[in-house]
Amino acid sequence: MEVIPFESLTLTDEQFLAGSEDGKRVTIAGELRLPRSGTDRLPAVILLHPSGGIGGQIADWEQWFLSLGVATFVVDSFTSRGIENTINDQSQLGRLAQTEDAYRALSLISKNPHVDASRVMLMGFSRGGQDTLYASMVRFQKAHADASTPGFAAYVPLYPDCSAHYLDDDNVSQAPIRIFHGSADNYDPVAPCKAYVERLKAKGADVELTEFAGVNHIFDARAFAHPTSLPKAQTVRNCAWEERSAGHLLNVKSNLPFSYADPCVERGVTIGYDESATEQTKKAIANLVTTTLKPTPTRAP
């Protein structure tokens, strides 16, 4: 394992949406793990953590991808910014900050001699899932991504929040987008994602949403073997926001700039592991990896 520091920016949502690169510079880090030694260039997946930071579920996914012959790069978007987690206070970091981190991570590892820049996938969870989803937007790529490197080969958001409606958000990458969500998710409900997917499909995007009946948020985290209540966790499940002019997010109900102090922002969610949903998600992602990243499986010693 190699810890690799790299420079990113801490941007407000307004700055990010306006295409600004004038945010506060920050050196964050990622952990690169390779499935095997050697000199060949490997496919890779960049992983964006949820509001709780890097936990056991990320380690599980790392080991799983490594077993498929895929290198992993886990981006820590919190530590260098002085954040432990954003569960109870999402205002600590812009909602699109991890998208900026993802683009910069892609630029970084694309230059790594062990990584094939044309075979890098982006995967994220909850907060990291929404940033994975919107990283597919062509508008954001033109404004913030490194034009000298290939784009992501695929996007895999797990239980993202889809309540925001950005300008040109139906113009996305031609790469596959595969979303996995639970019907019982009361943290980031699936309904807005279903509506967004329909808009994307109408524009010809290669997007699919897999919905698991009765499944909660964070369904892939074994640490939450039983449904767990987080009474203070902030959720925007009853909010809808819209970017009506570049850089300005408005609460659809009030027509005022969105704030986490808005009445629609509530507290109290349930999270919980679901083995069946996790295994079905792995099976689908394994198929995606085979078709898009084309790894050489790691052989057991």
Task: Label each residue range with its predicted role.
Residues 52-59, 63-67, 77-97, 135-143, ...:
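Cap/lid segment of the alpha/beta-hydrolase catalytic domain
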Residues 174-181, 185, 208-210:
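Catalytic His-Asp charge-relay segment
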